[in-house]
Swiss-Prot record:
Domain DOD-type homing endonuclease: 392-525
Classification via NCBIfam families: intein_Cterm, intein_Nterm, PRK04192.1, PRK14698.1
Signal sequence annotation: none
Family designation: Belongs to the ATPase alpha/beta chains family.
Misc. comment: The intein interrupts the ATP-binding site.
HAMAP family xref list: ATP_synth_A_arch (MF_00309)
Name of the molecule in the record: A-type ATP synthase subunit A
Primary location group: membrane
Catalysed reactions, semicolon-separated: ATP + H2O + 4 H(+)(in) = ADP + phosphate + 5 H(+)(out)
Native organism: Pyrococcus furiosus (strain ATCC 43587 / DSM 3638 / JCM 8422 / Vc1)
Gene: atpA
Enzyme Commission number, as recorded: 7.1.2.2, 3.1.-.-
Length: 1013
């Protein structure tokens, strides 16, 4: 009979209950009136300590606790693949349908669908003898993976009944087994297994078959074995964040620095602090702007985040944008293809000069803003910010000054002053006087109440020229109001250069200049900003050019409207081929297609004509009305630690930056998941921030399985347990994931399990241990941290599975560690390194130099090199180990020589050592460096890897021979084959790469003849 008790104490995720006589360790219980899911982790008499997997806020002493009689288990059967679960295997999509985006407490749902029918094909017949692990049937779970229905461990006997081939739910009995004792066991298509107990197998095999990933630095230098264990550090510093001075457009606060936004919202909701990171899930989401369905529109931000980064990337563009983000923050590039506008997310560290990034051209929306007039009693004021008030503000901000009791506007254009005076009378019922003050005319309006009203709108009383910024109310207004302000402001501080066909506005206020670009975006106008220094003071030139832009402000320009700024990256060739229309038809529309086929950029106005002909009007009139592609002119790495910030939005992007830009709200793990020759992938997002996990949930479904062309999700199970979910569920998620991986291993599949990150899991152990008041170990982690980590990684392995037939399966575990500040000496990393056999050390310096994968060849290691050597020698090349070791020796020697070069310079080295530097550089650039975004180089099969290595080793051996015979190194460096070796990674034909060996030998033979050697 299940135990029934009462809560006597609640402390965070831990609940203590008494009256639990008969309960067992690790038994699942239902806690409180809501029936929250928990697990007993300590028993003392009839008292039970329970870790609760849901938020415990509101639980009170006296509420009931009821045992279930079963331990924390997972359901294993058809329906696992493509699923997304939380840490205790609740299907998130089903929970969302039941309770919305925020999961209600006490809610549960079966992990596997009960009503879905699966096509079952029997593999045994009545009378067959079976044991645990035997396959009794198959189900095509996805188009990639066949699910093997197995006899659960511990059951054996004779098949007395088996279902015919057909459609069945997992709840239907598909077989009956008569055990030796005469008991009849009914088998369904699914089974349950406790997550803290490893699934049994017959025999553990040595890890001697490599898990081929197609990544040269891994497969050749630091191989992972099937059934092996590896660790990789998470991204250095923080995630996808921006600099604290980044402006962000909000409805509540106007244009505000993101660090100031964080301070305003800090703690206004559920706050979480972990190490140097902190974030708040907002009680009341704020409104920002983002890219959605081809337009820039209002969206909600639900979280604000603050962290730290060890370095930043600063990107400058042609229009004057300056973007400072973390290296892995994503920006948007794109181009128009025959399928429409294709936007691609590119990490900042991959951006280079000449690239074009998507920025904001037009921000939709806006409504008349109601003004707070409650404190204004002595003058009349408009109830809303209308066109006339906006125009008046333009005159005041452009040429005005607020004195204690007077509004003064200075301009020698008397008609402008009269217009401002007319508006003052109409809007406020006060009139001024136009006077001559030395060299300039002035409109003086004596009204302290008007001064107070204008200050309330944010217009500074002193030093206005350097400190003014665009009022929040203007940024939220409709285009007609914005246009009235802009035209008035230009009349004061602007200048139309007829010869250049552009309007130039000069201001001393940095925030004012950037605010103007946001206002112009409300009109669909883009501008450029340039800085200039006059008499030691910095000024900002806001330049509006282009016929279309000027016409939106009522300025007629006769000159050609092509500015070379608003150009559209177009895949003209593919569109032209798909179109199948003659050249003459396009020429008739004024489109010289040959110019664009040869690489000339197409202006937006030309693209509009082109789009009409090729059926892409929606792209031209919707998407490209709202974004343009700004050219990157400079990229710098800033090597200094600093605070960084982020927000979470529904669109995973937001409008921000000094000028309106689209900003995003990791490649190594994606490459491993996509290309490794594991058949099933289990990804555990353990304690990652919500927006980082969202990236995974978005990116994995987009990845294609390279072998079948089908979505990678068809062979993937995702477990999403973010850092704002209860800490106890984070602890359980690791066990849930490894149990699911073992189940697919038992079918005979090779499984890759990726845990991101085990550091967050260890932090969950630390928090629970602290609440249990256990004796702490190093840095507050529990004393049993090492044994728990070992227990997890030891469940990896390549095994002979249970069952009558010989079946081999494997679970390879790759755990990400996220040490604060990249500190590899902290306890989680050190204890992990004692257990795992492979460590891929990510190097921030390599990432800065755009060397990817950024795995450091001097600090990484693999203890599987000896074990997988025979496989490489038998299946690929008997020289693999010799070449690999020689290459490693050269790279290590290069590091030693570089220390000498730093002191005495390269010229002091002997020829042979300079030759080593040359070949080591070729190894780094032509072999280790690999382009994840290149169609060919993204995956390098084993045969290609050894062929490339043989080419490089041939070049090395011939170089050393030539040097010993007196050939100058300068002559060797000039050999034409070097350039071809540099391109071989992009060559798909292995025979063409192999031909470089003969070419290398021929060119060295000629060189030796030339020098008579």
């Amino acid at each position: 009979m299940p135990a029934k008790g009462r809560i006597i104490r609640v402390t965070g995720p831990l609940v203590i209950a008494d009256g639990m006589k008969g309960a067992k360790m690790y038994e699942v219980v239902r806690v409180g009136e809501l029936g929250l899911i928990g697990e007993i982790i300590r028993l003392e008499g009839d008292k039970a300590v329970i870790q609760v997997y849901e938020e415990t806020a509101g639980l009170k002493p006296g509420e009931p606790v009821e045992g279930t009689g079963s331990s924390l288990s997972v359901e294993l059967g058809p329906g696992l693949l493509t699923s997304i679960y939380d840490g205790i295997q609740r299907p998130l999509e089903v929970l969302r349908e039941k309770s919305g985006h925020f999961i209600a407490r006490g809610i549960s749902a079966p992990a596997l669908p009960r009503d879905k029918k699966w096509h079952f094909t029997p593999k045994v017949k009545v009378g067959d003898k079976v044991v645990g692990g035997d396959i009794i049937g198959e189900v095509p779970e996805t188009s990639i993976i066949v699910h093997k229905i197995m006899v659960p461990p511990g059951i054996e006997g004779e098949i007395v009944e088996i279902a015919d081939e057909g459609e069945y739910t997992i709840e239907e009995v598909i077989a009956k087994v008569k055990t030796p004792s005469g008991e009849i066991k009914e088998l369904k298509m699914y089974q349950r297994w406790p997550v803290r107990v490893k699934r049994p197998y017959k025999e553990k095999l040595p890890p001697e078959v490599p898990l081929v990933t197609g990544q040269r630095v891994i497969d050749t230098f630091f191989p992972q074995a099937k059934g092996g264990t590896a660790a990789i550090p998470g991204p250095f510093g923080s995630g996808k964040c921006v600099d604290g001075d980044t402006l962000i457009l909000t409805k509540e606060f106007g244009l505000i620095k993101i660090k100031d936004l964080y301070e305003k919202l800090d703690g206004k909701g559920r706050k979480t602090v972990e190490g140097n990171e902190e974030w708040t899930e907002l009680e009341e989401p704020i409104t920002v702007y983002g890219y959605k369905n081809g337009k820039i529109v209002e969206i909600k931000a639900t979280h604000v985040y603050k962290g730290a980064s060890s370095g930043m990337i600063e990107i400058k563009t042609r229009t004057g944008r300056k973007i400072k983000v973390t290296p892995i923050h994503k920006l948007f590039t794109g181009r128009v293809t025959k399928d429409g506008l294709v936007l691609e997310e590119v990490m900042a560290m991959h951006i280079k000069p000449g690239d074009r990034i998507a920025v904001v051209k037009k921000i939709d929306g806006g409504e008349y803003v109601k003004l707070d007039t409650s404190s204004v009693t002595k003058i009349k004021v408009p109830e809303v910010l209308n066109e006339e008030l906006a125009e008046f503000l333009g005159y005041v901000i452009g040429d005005g000054t607020l004195k204690p009791r007077t509004v003064a506007i200075y301009n020698n254009d008397e008609s402008l002053l009269k217009r401002a005076n007319f508006l003052a009378m109409k809007l406020f019922g006060v009139s001024g006087k136009i006077v001559q003050e030395r060299t300039v005319k002035a409109l003086l309006i004596h009204s302290k109440y008007l001064v107070d009203f204008l200050k309330k709108l944010g217009i500074p009383g002193n030093k206005k020229a350097r400190t003014w910024k665009v009022p929040k109310e203007l940024l939220l207004s409709p285009p007609s109001v914005v246009k009235a302000f802009i035209n008035a402001y230009i009349a004061c501080d602007g200048y139309y250069n007829k010869e250049k066909g552009e309007i130039e506005i000069v201001t001393a206020s940095e925030e004012g200049a950037y605010g103007l670009t946001y206002l112009l975006a409300k009109l669909g106008i883009y501008a450029t900003i340039r800085r200039k220094t006059i008499n030691g003071r910095e000024y900002y030139r806001v330049v509006i050019s282009g016929k279309a832009n000027l016409e939106k402000l009522g300025v007629k320009r006769e000159a050609r409207g092509y500015t070379s700024i608003d150009v559209v990256p177009v895949d003209v060739e593919s569109i032209y081929e798909a179109l199948g229309r003659p050249y003459s038809e396009l020429k008739k529309e004024g489109i010289e297609i040959h110019n664009y086929l040869s690489g000339e950029n197409m202006s937006y106005e030309t693209f509009r004509k082109f789009a009409k002909v090729v059926g892409l009007e929606e792209i031209a009139e919707n998407h490209l009305q709202h974004i343009l592609f700004d050219e990157v002119v400079e990229v710098n790495y800033i090597s200094e630690p600093q605070e960084v910030y982020d927000i979470t939005t529904e669109t995973h992007n937001f409008v921000g930056g000094n000028m309106p830009t689209l900003l995003h709200n990791t490649v190594t793990q994606h490459q491993l998941a996509k290309w490794s020759d594991a058949q099933v992938v289990v990804y555990i997002g353990c304690g990652e921030r919500g927006n980082e996990m969202t990236d995974v949930l978005e990116e994995f479904p987009k990845l294609k399985d390279p072998n079948t062309g089908k979505p990678l999700m068809e062979r993937t199970v995702l477990i999403a347990n973010t850092s704002n979910m209860p800490v106890a569920a984070r602890e359980a998620s690791i066990y849930t994931g490894i149990t699911i991986a073992e189940y697919f291993r038992d079918m005979g599949y090779d499984v890759a399990l990726m845990a991101d990150s085990t550091s967050r899991w260890a932090e969950a152990l630390r928090e629970i241990s602290g609440r249990l008041e256990e004796m702490p170990g190093e840095e507050g982690y529990p004393a049993y941290l090492a044994s728990r980590l070992a227990e997890f990684y030891e469940r990896a392995g390549r095994v002979v599975t249970l069952g009558s037939d010989y079946r081999v399966g494997s679970v390879s575990v790759i755990g990400a560690v996220s040490p604060p500040g990249g500190d590899f000496s902290e306890p989680v990393v050190q204890n992990t390194l004692r257990v795992v056999k492979v460590f891929w050390a990510l190097d921030a310096d390599l990432a800065r130099r755009r060397h990817f994968p950024a795995i450091n060849w001097l600090t990484s290691y693999s203890l599987y090199v000896d074990a997988v050597q025979d496989w490489w020698h038998k299946n690929v090349d008997p020289e693999w180990r010799r070449m690999r070791d020689k290459a490693m020796e050269l790279l290590q020697k290069e590091a030693e020589l570089q220390e000498i070069v730093r002191i005495v310079g390269p010229d002091a080295l002997p020829e042979r050592e300079r030759a080593i530097l040359l070949v080591a550089r070729m190894l780094r650039e032509d072999y280790l460096q690999q382009d994840a975004f290149d169609e060919v180089d993204t995956y390098c099969p084993p045969q290609k890897q050894v062929t490339m290595m043989r080419v490089l080793m041939t070049f090395y051996e011939r170089t050393m021979d030539a040097i010993s015979r007196g050939v100058p190194l300068e002559e060797i460096a000039k050999l034409p084959v070097r350039e071809e070796i540099g391109r071989m990674k992009f060559e798909p034909d292995i025979e063409k790469i192999r031909a470089l060996i003969d070419k290398t030998n021929e060119q060295f033979d000629e060189l030796l003849k030339k020098y008579g050697a």
